[in-house]
Amino acid sequence: MTCPNSSCVFEDKMCQGNKTAPANDAQLTPLVVVLSTISLVTVGLNLLVLYAVRSERKLHTVGNLYIVSLSVADLIVGVVVMPMNILYLLMSRWSLGRPLCLFWLSMDYVASTASIFSVFILCIDRYRSVQQPLKYLRYRTKTRASITILAAWFLSFLWIIPILGWRHFQPKTPEPREDKCETDFYNVTWFKVMTAIINFYLPTLLMLWFYAKIYKAVRQHCQHRELINGSFPSFSDMKMKPENLQVGAKKPGKESPWEVLKRKPKDTGGGPVLKPPSQEPKEVTSPGVFSQEKEEKDGELGKFYCFPLDTVQAQPEAEGSGRGYATINQSQNQLEMGEQGLSMPGAKEALEDQILGDSQSFSRTDSDTPAEPAPAKGKSRSESSTGLEYIKFTWKRLRSHSRQYVSGLHMNRERKAAKQLGFIMAAFIICWIPYFIFFMVIAFCESCCNQHVHMFTIWLGYINSTLNPLIYPLCNENFKKTFKKILHIRS
């Protein structure tokens, strides 16, 4: 029996320097049962992942497209590669013909390479999301992600060229044995080493570098958020009560902007009244903040609603003071999240904290310094304009800081995604590094190969396709809830 095929650069004849006696049926039966169970579990779990993403709307995100690509590659390993490996193990020789052998080799190389590249592009996606959250948010669409995934699979399918057409490039290549399933380049050391570097070592080193950057950025962001959260009172303490909106100490003879806005108008009859709009909540989409429609569809950012201000009235001060402010009835003002809300955990609290934070940082307007007396004619227009300008200024500050909070909310989501990526990369490296180290050793020393060790490293790499579907619900609450829903498991 020769060593069966494995991932992108595995060859049958690698262990020809150290042959062992074929195992008998009594020894093979338990092994076949275990390996068959692994194959069935791999197929079942990856089908569950694909069905979960298809059926659950919350999982229709750009990031999960890379998960789907990885699951498809793992599914091919479980459906085609593992069973044929077990069959080859039972037969001790290849008796299914050369065409089926080439099909098996092609599927093995393509699926294993696609799995590696899927983890790689997933890492790049997480890296860009963390390093440039708002800029990449506009660029990060399902179309672009799909193109990237197709490019990764296209590169993976390039393995078919040397597998099927090696003899067209190297006519003097010896004919393979009919009882072996091996590629025509099984003994070409330079080609195997080159492909191992391109397919595994280089992507792995880049992924480790990317993840180090991701970890550093997320850690700095968390430290920054702790400083911000420690600077302002929590939303639960404030309760959005009118009396709690009086922030900051009041200097003698001066009023804070919030107190000015809360002051009831005096009945002077001079200023025009802006009639309040209807009290029905209106859906708000800010072009620079929450108007990314594609992200709403992806489930990353939801909708929010604002109840309009009840009353806005131009209010003059005492006669001759020349100062006017907008008076807003705060008793009915509310900010209510929609049914869908922000899909990210803690998004609502984060947004509310930012609003309260901004309320403390509003700069004083012309309430601190008396303005020049306005002419009697057109005085009410001037006073009304002053109030509206202050409201406009307040809105601009809220919107500007909202941009920063969108970045913060996005980073919170990416922190959890980085955790998921960390587990995926750890499983990937632990499962595949033994095989590729062993491969590099025997590429230069065929007599150093041990068949049983080599067989173990092959299946350890295969088991990576079994572990990946277990990582998704472990690190993603939406996956966990969807899996429980599909399997009818009560929380």
Swiss-Prot record:
It is found in: Cell membrane. Residues 246-297, 360-385 are annotated as: Disordered. The modification Phosphoserine is found at S231, S384, S400, S402. Coiled coil: none annotated. The chain crosses the membrane at residues 31-51, 66-90, 99-124, 146-165, 190-212, 421-444, 451-473. Glycans are attached at N5, N18. Residues 52-65, 125-145, 213-420, 474-491 are cytoplasmic. Histamine activates the receptor by forming hydrogen bonds with transmembrane domains 3 and 6, squashing the ligand-binding pocket on the extracellular side and opening the cavity for G-protein engagement on the intracellular side. This is Histamine H1 receptor. It comes from Bos taurus (Bovine).
